[in-house]
Amino acid sequence: MNALPTPKSYGWHSRGYLPHFDGGSIPQSITFRLFDSLPQSVLDQWSHELSLQAEADREAELRTRIDAYLDKGYGSSYLRNNSVATIVQDALLFFDEQRYLLSAWLVMPNHVHVLTTPLPGHPLSKIMHSLKSFTSNEVNRILKRSGTLWMPDYHDRYIRNEKHFAAAVTYVENNPVKAGLCKRPSDWKFSSAWFRAQGE
């Protein structure tokens, strides 16, 4: 990516969970997770422990704790199943260059990281709703289960500049190495690093 796209802002919105910034053609780093990957009681405890910190420090520390917890692979970890991970990865790739530009992605056992730039006319909120709805139906079908698959919300962070973009790619692709699941980013099959290593 040689230059960041010209912003076309849709503004802030919230469904009552996390506030989101639909920034139009601004790259955004997204994390969404399985419904049982992180108990609400743990989040509540962390929020209480961090309540006296400044807001910026509190949010940064909470994000660090969440990421570390997710990397331990708690919960059902349905995405550890290759067929399930394939459904999610294929869904991400399907609308690349149609609804968004997909720069990096990673399907971990209980969560997914995506670095993407929504294309004009495709707000991030609608992209995420479509992606989670489709994959939930398909995964439930092959696992012969019903009910909730994903947490209803997602964490998003817009990319400020080229340096931040490069750091986000590295963070996403290095996640399975950091979690002790493989030795190199390109060893993890359900990732942009693996695809790039295959020349795809």
Segments predicted by a language model, with ranges:
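Short catalytic/metal-binding and nucleic-acid-binding patches
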Residues: 1-200
